[in-house]
Amino acid sequence: MRMMVAGGGTGGHVFPGIALAEEVVTRHPANDVVFVGTARGLEASVVPAAGFPIELIEVKGLKGKGIAGALLNLLLLPRAFLQSWRILRRWRPDVVVGVGGYASGPVVLTAWAMRIPTAVQEQNAIAGLTNRLLGRVVKAAFTAFPEAARHFAARKVYQLGNPIRRRLMENYMRPESAHGQPRLLVFGGSQGAHALNMRVIEALPHLADLRERIQITHQTGARDREYVEKGYRACGFTPDVREFIDDMSAAYAGCDLVVCRAGATTLAELTVCKKPSILVPFPAAADNHQVKNARSLVDAGAAVMIEERDLTGEVLAREIREILDAPERRERMARAAGRLGSPQAAKEIADVCMELVRRRWGSPFGQAREPGQKPARPPDPAS
């Protein structure tokens, strides 16, 4: 089976696509996955780094661009559809999955017109504009939150959760790493989050009495690293401040509490890794979807939410202290998070995709390929 994953822009769209691709290629040596995105999106760098091929199209978003900007970007669509048609003709995928972001629109619509089975994967509680539009034509809509189902026909909805990267799945099987002191993990996404970084520094004086009893690992992004490290030292903390955390699996396994944003991929990781959290939704997220995402964990008892307009150093310090000082509460939050986890999401989405392929092409392996044609796959780590 050959799958095409279309879309991207942010890690919240790209990483679930990579997680699904990892599942597909491990099922059969002839399976492969190709991505389609834009040169400006995160996919242009992280997809090749994951070992998958990527094709690029020229397209820009329409929402929030103003009338003039939207009209200019509309003029790019005919070219984007032509590029999509050429890519689809060249790769001949058996199924196309849109993961959100404006790059997915032309590819999924063109695939539908070519009678290739199509699906969308919606990561958030409020479906994005592109996925809402594509939902009218695709065969399946994979959702992670019950609230997202209202954007799609009921017969198309599969609420299976968000796929997470294979390395992070280790947390589902591995035990907690042993440590004596409470450990706090802070991050704002792959690029960091400036406002969150600043509020944590403001919280440190209110936690000064804990500096000998707490360990904090803080991912800041490149912009704030030096300033944040100085802030920790000024308050007497031994800093573990990093621009980027390469091994998030180990970071999750080694912490007792997480302070972070409320992107869908982050929440999927928190629930599979069974981590209590303090969530600070990104206020500029489209349709305020991070607040809706966070509420699902708050309502289940797995997290505390502080909206950024209410976030001060004192408020954040109080919440951190109350949770870290209450082991039984942390345990209850961890159990609640685990009940929301979907460790099988990638597998179950791949199962549905294979059924779509079987219905269209008569075999779960898809269309016949030319003799000698090698599948496009990431290199085998064992080789």
Curated annotation (Swiss-Prot):
Pathway: Cell wall biogenesis; peptidoglycan biosynthesis
Family matches, as Pfam families: Glyco_tran_28_C, Glyco_transf_28
Lineage: Bacteria, Pseudomonadati, Myxococcota, Myxococcia, Myxococcales
EC number: 2.4.1.227
Signal peptide: none
NCBIfam families in UniProt: murG
Keyword Cell division recorded: yes
Record keywords: Cell cycle, Cell division, Cell inner membrane, Cell membrane, Cell shape, Cell wall biogenesis/degradation, Glycosyltransferase, Membrane, Peptidoglycan synthesis, Transferase
Topology within the bilayer: Peripheral membrane protein
Subcellular location: Cell inner membrane
Catalytic reaction list: di-trans,octa-cis-undecaprenyl diphospho-N-acetyl-alpha-D-muramoyl-L-alanyl-D-glutamyl-meso-2,6-diaminopimeloyl-D-alanyl-D-alanine + UDP-N-acetyl-alpha-D-glucosamine = di-trans,octa-cis-undecaprenyl diphospho-[N-acetyl-alpha-D-glucosaminyl-(1->4)]-N-acetyl-alpha-D-muramoyl-L-alanyl-D-glutamyl-meso-2,6-diaminopimeloyl-D-alanyl-D-alanine + UDP + H(+)
GO BP terms, alphabetized: carbohydrate metabolic process; cell division; cell wall organization; lipid glycosylation; peptidoglycan biosynthetic process; regulation of cell shape
Organism: Anaeromyxobacter dehalogenans (strain 2CP-1 / ATCC BAA-258)
Function: Cell wall formation. Catalyzes the transfer of a GlcNAc subunit on undecaprenyl-pyrophosphoryl-MurNAc-pentapeptide (lipid intermediate I) to form undecaprenyl-pyrophosphoryl-MurNAc-(pentapeptide)GlcNAc (lipid intermediate II).
Region (Disordered): 363-383
Protein family: Belongs to the glycosyltransferase 28 family. MurG subfamily.
Protein name: UDP-N-acetylglucosamine--N-acetylmuramyl-(pentapeptide) pyrophosphoryl-undecaprenol N-acetylglucosamine transferase
